[in-house]
Amino acid sequence: MVRKPVVATISKGGYLQGNMSGRLPSMGDQEPPGQEKVVLKKKITLLRGVSIIIGTVIGSGIFISPKGILQNTGSVGMSLVFWSACGVLSLFGALSYAELGTSIKKSGGHYTYILEVFGPLLAFVRVWVELLVIRPGATAVISLAFGRYILEPFFIQCEIPELAIKLVTAVGITVVMVLNSTSVSWSARIQIFLTFCKLTAILIIIVPGVIQLIKGQTHHFKDAFSGRDTSLMGLPLAFYYGMYAYAGWFYLNFITEEVDNPEKTIPLAICISMAIITVGYVLTNVAYFTTISAEELLQSSAVAVTFSERLLGKFSLAVPIFVALSCFGSMNGGVFAVSRLFYVASREGHLPEILSMIHVHKHTPLPAVIVLHPLTMVMLFSGDLYSLLNFLSFARWLFMGLAVAGLIYLRYKRPDMHRPFKVPLFIPALFSFTCLFMVVLSLYSDPFSTGVGFLITLTGVPAYYLFIVWDKKPKWFRRLSDRITRTLQIILEVVPEDSKEL
């Protein structure tokens, strides 16, 4: 059976079409009547959607080192203003994605919207960088935080060995991959539990902070807008840190096809999640300042631990566990969502065919999940992991800005397009400008890293013409590619998705 992708792909087909019995039939076989289709099921309810957004946005930063904004604003009051403003701007981006997700009912997020508006080249470059660098690197970073804080209660009196951190991290990554390969339902249920843990951890900080306010502990808020002298360059950097802290609201759009009743669920999940996150972030910072001065917060290596040691006594030992669970939730949500990006890109012919196949029994995009495992392990044991991510930090904002600018373009080019959820045009316009500002700021503040990242991103252009456009590849290459695909199908028990209405 030969697949016909949107554009020429590495292999011209030759994979095997399977069925729910796990058998790979011959061309003459008939599918039993009433047999369940091999597709990704619509199992993402409103609660699960909310848990995915909250679970991926809230990582370790708010608990460990929320000082980037304070350091660059110079005052308690201005830092709280920036936390609130960045929450509102992130909500604008999320609302823009809600319109895109309900108008273009396909999974894939940025990739799908860029493909729809700007064509295959830019879309391929987006998924190229995401697959090879950004997602493995980001997963490794949040996983390292998980490994460090899960071990911290066992190494109170001494430094945690780096090898131990990486080994525990590797175990955590493997558990996440296995979980997402095994069951969509269980991944979503565990994500709900981990989101509950995150919110519990935030409440453990907020409630004592509110009690402190009731007791009159407001001396750190006196002259809240006076403090250290801050250069004008500091304010854009504070804005950059704030927007980065809210990043992750777009992940629900990566799994649009699995969302139950997306026209209602996506906008509701986005609004509920962003409201909870913004209020939670602001109140957590307010709680910190009821007990910790601005100077102490800037010097602390783990703000939540410092806060809990002063107010909660021995209960502060639980904070590292909550941070580890928070990191695990970010790992799980990120892998769950981004695997669908690779799945959709493969379905469009931009990645190897095997990545668009589904397990015949578990109905999970197994190859698209496990492809992240070796790439993440390489990143985990790489010495320049953080530098590599810094090189490519601008790319996220560039492609998000393009996707939201595409919304404005579609308003004028396709005015009759069905839009169940529609936002005022100033919202995507303001957010697109915000993304442009973030890219320019990256270039201005660190031109070398941004330049290197831009060059890495540009490698996607020759890769596109070599792997996608060039369709006169040697026959031996095609045969080898098809043989590898068929072998992996048999080993992994995966088949192409049955056709379905989107």
From Swiss-Prot:
UniProt topological domain (Extracellular) ranges: 65-74, 151-163, 211-234, 287-317, 386-387, 444-449
Function per UniProt: Heterodimer with SLC3A2, that functions as an antiporter by mediating the exchange of extracellular anionic L-cystine and intracellular L-glutamate across the cellular plasma membrane. Provides L-cystine for the maintenance of the redox balance between extracellular L-cystine and L-cysteine and for the maintenance of the intracellular levels of glutathione that is essential for protection of cells from oxidative stress.
Gene from which the chain derives: Slc7a11
PTM: Ubiquitinated by TRIM26; leading to proteasomal degradation.
Protein's UniProt name: Cystine/glutamate transporter
Residues that, per the record, bind L-glutamate: 135, 244
Membrane association type: Multi-pass membrane protein
Catalytic activity from the UniProt record: L-cystine(out) + L-glutamate(in) = L-cystine(in) + L-glutamate(out); an L-alpha-amino acid(in) + L-kynurenine(out) = an L-alpha-amino acid(out) + L-kynurenine(in); N-acetyl-L-cysteine(out) + L-glutamate(in) = N-acetyl-L-cysteine(in) + L-glutamate(out)
